[in-house]
Amino acid sequence: MSFNNALLQGDHECVSLSNVVLHLHVGIRDWERSPDRAQKVRIDADCLRPLQSPPADIAECIDYSRLYRYLTTEWPARGHVDLIETLAHDFINFAYKDETLTAVRVRITKLDVYLDTAEPSFQIIKYR
């Protein structure tokens, strides 16, 4: 986790969702706009809140399945998006519907843009 600990007060718990790979229509280049050419995109996210007592049941936990379902159902259905930055902001807004969260990090990486191993990515770290 790459959060700057100096910005966090007290102890926190974190749920991470890693290596979610989707095929999305995203990009500004002509070849990225082709309807039959979806971009392979990886999403990694961390959601933090102040440390809670040990949970008595699942309802007291950060629901990573809610985040996963949103990414895997809503994003592929939304059609073409020019910028991964737009997707990152969208994820932050969705994650913060959980009012217990105090910090969210999302990193979106385009996996097949270049012919070599280079991978452009965009990251947001937002504190509430």
Residue ranges and their predicted role:
Residues 1-128:
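N-terminal, polar/charged subdomain of small-to-medium soluble alpha/beta proteins
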